[in-house]
């Protein structure tokens, strides 16, 4: 029996599969995709011995930050200790003042404000022996400092989950001097704003590249629902 005949005979299996997949919440798929992307970035950088800090902008509930620490511990056992430290930035109060150019119906303070104490308590519980620090505050304050003031020497993996262009631009400018060949940057909301090239994380990245032509990037992989990763190839 050839493959086409098998497919025709067991059409009900396709129908069942389609029904199951259709009911999986998009947020669940998005989250799993994000986890796998972080794990992939940590593995690639460990494999190529690109050492430094894991930096996350927009930790929200801390789920991906916690996952990064767990994934790194697993990869360390496989490829050897990387001495990676983890730094997370978030206001825990939402976006604060949002420029009109960053307006989006889904990006509202009441959606992204979280209980800071609960988040930090959960991160502490999951950190085990991993080195980490959480920097609270709006980016227009916390990211005016130099990375060295937070103990950051080089960036290994950067997760930009800022949603807005202004916040993403502040994050990119902050890490400018700690980028190295092999650093992987993950843009978690790369495709939003209906693909507008001047808005959101995409717009911030395009502007950053234009202002820093000496830094070269190569697409690494895509993940989730319109998220994308890039690797620094020249600096």
Q: For each of these PLM feature ranges, what is it?
A:
Residues 33-36, 63:
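Aromatic- and histidine-enriched alpha-helix N-cap/loop-to-helix transition segments
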Residues 36-49:
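Conserved alpha-helix/loop element of class I SAM-dependent methyltransferases that forms part
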Residues 19-29, 48-235:
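S-adenosylmethionine/decaboxylated-SAM
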């Amino acid at each position: 029996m050839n493959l086409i005949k098998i497919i025709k005979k067991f059409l009900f299996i396709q129908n069942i599969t389609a029904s199951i997949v259709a009911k999986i919440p998009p947020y669940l798929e998005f989250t799993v995709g994000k986890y796998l992307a972080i794990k992939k970035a940590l593995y690639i950088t460990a494999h190529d011995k690109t050492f430094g800090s894991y930096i996350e902008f927009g930790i929200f509930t801390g789920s991906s930050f916690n996952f990064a620490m767990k994934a790194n511990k697993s990869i360390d056992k496989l490829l050897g200790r990387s001495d990676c430290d983890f730094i997370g930035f978030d206001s825990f109060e939402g976006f604060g003042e949002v420029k009109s150019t960053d307006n989006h119906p889904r990006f509202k303070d009441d959606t992204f404000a979280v209980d800071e104490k609960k988040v930090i308590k959960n991160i502490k519980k999951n950190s085990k022996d991993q080195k980490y620090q959480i920097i609270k505050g709006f980016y227009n304050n916390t990211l005016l400092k130099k990375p060295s003031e937070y103990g950051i020497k080089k960036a290994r993996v950067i997760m930009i989950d800022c949603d807005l262009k202004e916040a993403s631009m502040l994050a990119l400018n902050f890490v400018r001097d700690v980028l190295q060949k092999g650093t992987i940057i993950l843009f978690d909301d790369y495709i939003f704003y209906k693909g507008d090239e001047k808005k959101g994380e995409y717009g911030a990245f395009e502007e950053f590249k234009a202002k820093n032509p000496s830094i070269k990037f190569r697409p690494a992989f895509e993940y989730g629902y319109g998220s994308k990763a890039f690797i620094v190839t020249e600096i």
